[in-house]
Amino acid sequence: MIIYLHGFDSNSPGNHEKVLQLQFIDPDVRLISYSTRHPKHDMQHLLKEVDKMLQLNVDERPLICGVGLGGYWAERIGFLCDIRQVIFNPNLFPYENMEGKIDRPEEYADIATKCVTNFREKNRDRCLVILSRNDESLNSQRTSEELHHYYEIVWDEEQTHKFKNISPHLQRIKAFKTLG
């Protein structure tokens, strides 16, 4: 089972395309939708939905995937639910760059302070990070500097922030999922 979390643009047709691409790895791909506008509510909702899916799951090696803001959540929810994560161009600093787009961006900073202390150290090697060198929305170099101590970083030379085509990375993702 692969759980997919969309980014800020929840209505993007690219979400459906990514789900279809992920089905080449595992036919059981589940999209969880969330508001993107209310961080604390989103966290509760995502934890509840992922936990529900894991309770009904028969896959011994489930995976959670997210793009952009979905990558922010996939890393945290995956850690809290003890499943491996694959994150594409994760938005690690939504409290800095989501002002005016969401109701309370400061809630992201609050969530960060309430999360398990040093969670990335405890999550070491359980997350695969795929970054675009052509990310027009986020500073992928800053993201790499933040995460490379803990996770493998894979660079993509062609995709933009929304990462429309993940197919060149499917074999790597499948291998990572298999490690479970």
Swiss-Prot record:
Lineage: Bacteria, Pseudomonadati, Pseudomonadota, Gammaproteobacteria, Enterobacterales
SUPFAM superfamilies named among the record's database cross-references: alpha/beta-Hydrolases
Name listed for the protein in its UniProt record: UPF0227 protein YcfP
Organism of derivation: Escherichia coli O7:K1 (strain IAI39 / ExPEC)
Family as reported in the entry's similarity comment: Belongs to the UPF0227 family.
Disulfide bonds: none
